[in-house]
Regions:
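Short, hinge-like loop/turn segments at secondary-structure boundaries
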Residues: 93-94, 115-118, 211-213, 247-248, ...
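Short acidic/polar active-site loop segments enriched in Thr and Asp
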Residues: 97, 191, 227, 326, ...
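Proteins enriched for Cys/Gly/acidic motifs involved in redox and nucleic-acid/cofactor modification
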Residues: 1-203, 242, 253, 257, ...
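Conserved N-terminal phosphate-binding loop of PLP-dependent enzymes in the Aspartate aminotransferase
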Residues: 225, 325, 340-344, 352
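Short glycine-enriched, charge-decorated loop/helix-capping segments at active-site entrances
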Residues: 47-48, 167, 207-210, 270-276, ...
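Terminal RNA-binding accessory module
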Residues: 343-440
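Conserved SAM/AdoMet-binding glycine-rich loop
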Residues: 75-77, 84, 187-313, 321
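Conserved, mostly hydrophobic/aromatic
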Residues: 178, 195, 231, 259, ...
């Protein structure tokens, strides 16, 4: 039988998808990307913000309609929306056969069996459970890079965030398990490991009594075949001297950190439930750049948080202009039910949120272009992602570029390159967020 798997949302959700795909493949199910070929449809949903929720609902309704009129025998919904609105989905969309909560995805085979048997039910587990199925993941990212989810859940409880209620408290994956998984990924040809979690920098505190990300990184660096290790979702206040030292000493660790700060005004930061002040953020960024001069820093910001004044927005703009982050994304605040911030009375109009977002991204575009121009003439190591259709050119990424969120480098060459290969490239031109180069 053939299964269509639709994975929505973040890279952490994608890891869950790949685990489920591995379990299904081990049972002999064949995967398809064509809905008309599918006997079973599985949708791994997201509901972190309003747009993600809408996308999940749209996909569920579209596949429900297809199941009603097509050949699919079962429709299963998993992921964050399934955890949050489990019974509503089952009750209001009769075409959905099974709903799997966020900590029950390891029961995907049971869900398929139940759906094919005509059952309609919700399968959940303790929200603080940590599924660790033994089946190897089916990597869907092209084979040369893969995400390694090192922890689940979050204890921070920022006032705008629903994650602790749908993903549970912070809990780390045992180190030996992660090393085994990383070795398996390397054996499959993966060359870049991208460490993800709701918060990577707190890794190990719950298991080992201390933050153990530096130790994990040193162990991962020993794995043959792995060339790059990249760290995403680092909370600024959890950055330690030991982590910085490991990044300086281990050549496999990309000099790149994803450091979400969300805002730069102290009043708003406190209302958000963040643990850092504006000055502390400045100090952290300056320290990282002093200790690792070629580090690439990515951050994210929320615009239009309840109560944000024009003056506070301008303070954020000045902060960005001063610190000049290498990579930056800005998102409009989305009120999520069951979060404290959604009950704040001083909500901001959508138009104001969007205008402030546009202000930030216009400024960041200028910063990004200046930084791209600074790269001209430099020699960089590039991981090849693929060939540009109908052209003698390839696309790749430098250590400064995480997949799907950062830029690319376009390489003009007649030489045949293979996805996953590394090549030395001289940067010859700059675009807004991308680079142009030639093979050396």
């Amino acid at each position: 039988m053939k299964i269509l798997f639709i994975s929505l949302g973040c890279d952490k959700n994608l890891v869950d998808t790949e685990v489920m795909l591995g379990m299904l493949a081990s049972r002999g199910y064949e995967m398809t990307n064509e809905e008309q070929e599918a006997d079973i449809i599985v949708i791994n949903t997201c509901c972190f913000i309003h747009d993600a929720k809408e996308e999940s609902i749209q996909n569920i309704l579209e596949m429900a309609e297809y199941k009603k009129n097509g050949s699919a025998k079962a429709l299963i919904v998993t992921g964050c929306m399934a955890e949050r609105y489990r019974q509503e989905i089952l009750d209001e969309i009769p075409e959905v056969d099974e709903v799997l909560g966020t900590t029950a995805y390891d029961r995907i085979l049971d869900a398929v069996d139940a759906a094919l048997a005509g059952q309609h039910e919700v399968m959940t587990a303790d929200l603080d459970a940590l599924p660790l199925p033994e089946t190897k993941r089916l990597v869907t990212t092209g084979g040369h890079f893969a995400y390694l989810k090192i922890a689940e859940g979050c204890d921070k409880h920022c006032t705008y965030c629903i994650i602790p209620k749908i993903r549970g408290n912070f809990r780390s994956v045992p180190m030996e398990r992660l090393i085994k998984e990383a070795e398996e990924l390397a054996d499959q040809g993966v060359k870049e490991l991208i460490l993800v979690a709701q918060e990577t920098t707190l890794y190990g505190k719950d298991l080992y009594g201390e933050k153990s990300l530096p130790k994990l990184l040193r162990e991962l660096c020993k794995i043959s075949g792995i060339r790059w290790i990249r760290i995403l979702y680092c909370y600024p206040e959890e950055i330690t001297d030991e982590l910085i030292q490991v990044m300086k000493e281990e050549p496999k660790i990309c000099h790149y950190l994803d450091l979400p700060i969300q805002h730069a005004n102290d009043t708003i930061l406190k209302r958000m439930g963040r643990r850092t002040s504006k000055q502390e953020l400045i100090d952290i960024v300056q320290k990282l750049r002093k200790e690792i001069p070629d580090i690439c820093l990515r951050t994210t910001l929320i615009t239009g948080f309840p109560g944000e004044t024009q003056e506070q927005h301008e303070e954020v703009m000045e902060f960005i202009d001063t610190l000049e982050f290498d990579r930056l994304g800005a998102f409009t605040y989305s009120p999520e039910e069951d979060t404290p911030a959604a009950t704040f009375e001083d909500q901001i109009d959508e138009e104001v949120k969007e205008n402030r977002q546009a202000d930030i991204m216009e400024l960041q575009q200028e910063i990004a272009f200046d930084k791209a121009e600074d790269m001209i003439g430099r020699e960089v190591l590039v991981m090849i992602e693929g060939k540009v259709a109908d052209e003698n050119a390839y696309v790749g990424r430098t250590y400064r570029d995480a997949p799907n969120v950062d830029g690319l480098i376009f390489i003009n060459t007649d030489v045949e390159l293979i996805s996953g290969d590394f090549a030395k490239v001289k940067v010859t031109g700059a675009l807004d967020y991308d680079l142009i180069g030639e093979l050396m």
